[in-house]
Amino acid sequence: MFEKLLVPVDLSPQSQMMATAAARMASYGVREVVLYSALEHHSKRDPLLKAIDDRLGESGLKHRVVTEVRKDPASAILKAAEAQGSTMIAMAASGKGRVREFFVGSTSLAVIRRSKLPVLLDKFPMEADSDPVGFVEHSPGLLDSVLVTLDLSKATKHMMPYVQQLVDAGARRVTLLHVVQSSRYSITDERRFQEVNRKLEEHRSKLETGDCQVDTYVRFGTSTYNILESAREAEATLIMLGTTGKSYLRGATLGST
């Protein structure tokens, strides 16, 4: 999953941090990073792009820069990922370049919805803009604590191989989470909670965990609130969500916290 990353950059502090994070991921199996810029005014001679390229060079990772002129950033990113043979797209959730916005919510969402590859979406705090490199270098490892949200539908079986890949890549701790929906079940529905616990344990038992600590966790209520609360409690460094379409799993979205 991590072997060949496509990292779209708009040269904002956010995309600089994403590229720096990619440079730290060699231990997770990253072998090559392709820096991709689709902004019209950029070229390989841009000093900021060169600085990011140099940082990747210091990491020892194989890397290169691809620049293109494109009007639709989401389509450009997806086409570039396919053309470069990427195994994952790693991008900042939002950012503002020196000329115009590139990564906005709609772009990130479009990439997630349409990508057949896993997407690593990283959102960095605004206060990190003053020292983007220092912020990333002092942050915990991406796979230190992974929260995996499972809806326990038929699509879950397609998601578990991605979880195994995270474990194999060096995840220290993985928490398998299911939220029992308050709109469909009662908190006193013992039968439902027993069924959920059984299914989570089945998925946990099939993982080859090695040195990784794998826990299961069940919450009750609405998905968004409980995922965020669980991430806070587990001190999650990464949240893994399945993305679905027409009842089958198309890929996985990884969101760094």
Where are these regions (language model features)?
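Intrinsically disordered or low-complexity boundary/linker segments at protein termini
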Residues: M1-M17, R24, M88, A110-M159, ...
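Residues at the starts of beta-strands that form the adenosine-phosphate
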Residues: K4, R31-V34, K62, D144-S145, ...
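Short, well-ordered secondary-structure micro-motifs
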Residues: M18, R45-D46, F102, D131-P132, ...
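A structural alpha-helix within SAM-dependent methyltransferase catalytic domains
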Residues: A19, A23, S27, L78, ...
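Acidic, proline/glycine-rich short linear motifs
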Residues: T20-K62, T67, K79-E82, F135-E137, ...
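Structural beta-alpha unit
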Residues: E40-H41, D54, E58-I89, S94-G97, ...
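Gly/Ser-rich helix-loop-strand patches that form or flank binding pockets
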Residues: A81-G134, A231-T257
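Conserved small-residue-rich
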Residues: S139-L207
